[in-house]
Amino acid sequence: MGIPQKSLVIGACAIACHYPELSLNDAAGDALQLAEKIRLYGIEENQKKETVFIAACRFVSADKDLTPQKAVEKALRLWDIIEA
């Protein structure tokens, strides 16, 4: 299972709210790009996958210079810190 549509919409909304100059298509594209990066990690646990996605969207929405890869890495580090 990939990222649920509900979470994709929430993630795209977080990005769009912080960058109103972006079109909704661009915000959705950014969210889908983050979802693809997470898919490449092969995370099997759905809760982890979805949580990392939302965190990565929030990181991107706070720092437009943050690459999708770095946002996902940062979200995964945060997951590991909280999980420890």
Name each model feature, range by range.
Residues 3-20, 24-63, 68-83:
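Amphipathic alpha-helical segments in structured regions that serve as interaction surfaces
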